[in-house]
């Protein structure tokens, strides 16, 4: 079982007198910066010119280029998309790191897969809230918190663990609990969850269910409701209280169908395929493929995305959602 740390375990905040540079001001960046500031930390924001720069300024932060922010900071938290981090790190952060600084991440991908190679004289750790930035900020403002993970990759100063817990405490995570892990474990489990269950697994299951009903002659609109739209109702029940809560809340007919049919859909062969997915994450196959795809301009990524967006379930869904003005996407579709 994971070791969990709480507020009582952070007796001395070793970062309170240090300057923290938050690199990036998106979902996580704005939450980290504002929570740290509210907890008395000296925070600056490092960005390239654009809308985020203006937003951080409006929120009252001193905003600098990434290089300028990194140069003056003791702690540099990189909250940029994974694929952008190596270039920004090499060009603007690495030349400005000093011995004893802390290089911090919210996901271990680039360090674990050697895309970012920190110098030996800095501490390297991650603090990863298990929720989106808006929730990290809102719960903090309400006196609560989102749990987080932390891991130490490199302890150059001898107090990297204390620094990581101090940072986690600064964003409020110790109110809920901070679980200790490693860069390897955080990275591999995160990627596996996305690919086998949360994104890849769910989308493949939803499409297969939709196609099965449509191919059998049922109306696409009903197939959409049964296989996609109602998924939120079930996921919310699981989110709130696990599988037990979901099964308690649905009808007995639905629960019995769960018991007798679920294992016939997700079979031992499915688990073997999941094992293959995990192995390709562990040995770096997935990472190498994604890095190469990004460097090539993402031709397959964009082609697949365009094709998927025209699947019948998407065409039907767009029409049905026009009937439901209460359903509004949090992020405008097509922004990527």
Swiss-Prot record:
Residue positions binding Mg(2+) 2: 190, 226, 230
Superkingdom per UniProt: Bacteria
Residues that hold Mg(2+) 1 according to the record: 190, 194
Binding-site residues for NADP(+), renumbered to this chain: 25-28, 48, 52, 82-85, 133
Binding site for substrate: 251
InterPro entries the UniProt entry points to: 6-PGluconate_DH-like_C_sf, KARI, KARI_C, KARI_N, KARI_prok, NAD(P)-bd_dom_sf
Cofactor: binding comment: Binds 2 magnesium ions per subunit.
One Gene Ontology biological process: isoleucine biosynthetic process
SUPFAM superfamilies the UniProt entry points to: 6-phosphogluconate dehydrogenase C-terminal domain-like, NAD(P)-binding Rossmann-fold domains
Entry's Gene Ontology molecular function annotations: ketol-acid reductoisomerase activity; magnesium ion binding; NADP binding
EC number per UniProt: 1.1.1.86
Active site: 107
Matches recorded under PROSITE patterns: KARI_C, KARI_N
Database matches in Pfam families: KARI_C, KARI_N
This protein's record includes keyword NADP: yes
UniProt keyword annotations, A-Z: Amino-acid biosynthesis, Branched-chain amino acid biosynthesis, Magnesium, Metal-binding, NADP, Oxidoreductase
Cofactor requirements of the protein: Mg(2+)
Keyword Amino-acid biosynthesis set for record: yes
UniProt pathway: Amino-acid biosynthesis; L-isoleucine biosynthesis; L-isoleucine from 2-oxobutanoate: step 2/4; Amino-acid biosynthesis; L-valine biosynthesis; L-valine from pyruvate: step 2/4
Catalytic reactions of this protein: (2R)-2,3-dihydroxy-3-methylbutanoate + NADP(+) = (2S)-2-acetolactate + NADPH + H(+); (2R,3R)-2,3-dihydroxy-3-methylpentanoate + NADP(+) = (S)-2-ethyl-2-hydroxy-3-oxobutanoate + NADPH + H(+)
Residue ranges occupied by any KARI N-terminal Rossmann domain in the UniProt entry: 2-181
KARI C-terminal knotted domain ranges (all copies): 182-327
Record-stated family: Belongs to the ketol-acid reductoisomerase family.
NCBIfam families given in the database record: ilvC (TIGR00465), PRK05479.1 (NF004017), PRK13403.1 (NF009940)
Protein name in UniProt: Ketol-acid reductoisomerase (NADP(+)) 1
Biological classification of the source: Bacteria, Bacillati, Bacillota, Bacilli, Bacillales
Gene it is expressed from: ilvC1
């Amino acid at each position: 079982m994971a070791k969990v740390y709480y507020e009582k375990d952070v007796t001395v905040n070793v970062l309170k007198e240090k300057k923290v540079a938050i690199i990036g001001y998106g979902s996580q960046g704005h939450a980290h910066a504002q929570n740290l500031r509210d907890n008395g930390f000296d925070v600056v924001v490092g960005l390239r010119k654009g809308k985020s720069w203006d937003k951080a300024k409006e929120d009252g932060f001193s905003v600098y280029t990434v290089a300028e922010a990194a140069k003056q900071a003791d702690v540099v938290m990189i909250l940029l998309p994974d694929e952008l981090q190596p270039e920004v790190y090499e060009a603007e952060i690495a030349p400005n790191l000093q011995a004893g600084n802390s290089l911090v991440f919210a996901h271990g991908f680039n360090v674990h897969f050697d895309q970012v190679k920190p110098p030996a004289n800095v501490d390297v750790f991650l603090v990863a809230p298990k929720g989106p930035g808006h929730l990290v900020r809102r719960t903090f403002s309400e006196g609560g918190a989102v749990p987080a993970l932390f891991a130490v990759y490199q302890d150059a100063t001898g107090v990297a663990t204390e620094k990581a817990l101090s940072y986690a405490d600064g964003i409020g995570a110790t109110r809920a609990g901070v679980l200790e892990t490693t860069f390897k474990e955080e990275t591999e489990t995160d990627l596996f969850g996305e690919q086998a269950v949360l994104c890849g697994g769910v989308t493949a299951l939803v499409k297969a269910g939709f196609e099965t009903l449509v191919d059998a002659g049922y109306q696409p609109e009903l197939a959409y409701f049964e296989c996609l739209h109602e998924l939120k109702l079930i996921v919310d029940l699981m989110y709130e209280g696990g599988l037990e809560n979901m099964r308690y809340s649905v009808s007995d007919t639905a629960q019995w169908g769960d018991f007798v049919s679920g294992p016939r859909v997700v079979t031992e062969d499915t688990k073997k395929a999941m094992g293959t997915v995990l192995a390709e994450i562990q040995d770096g196959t997935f990472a190498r493929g994604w890095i190469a795809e990004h460097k090539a301009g993402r031709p397959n990524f964009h082609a697949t995305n365009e094709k998927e967006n025209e699947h019948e379930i998407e065409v039907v869904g767009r029409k049905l959602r026009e009937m439901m003005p209460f359903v509004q996407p949090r992020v405008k579709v097509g922004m990527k």
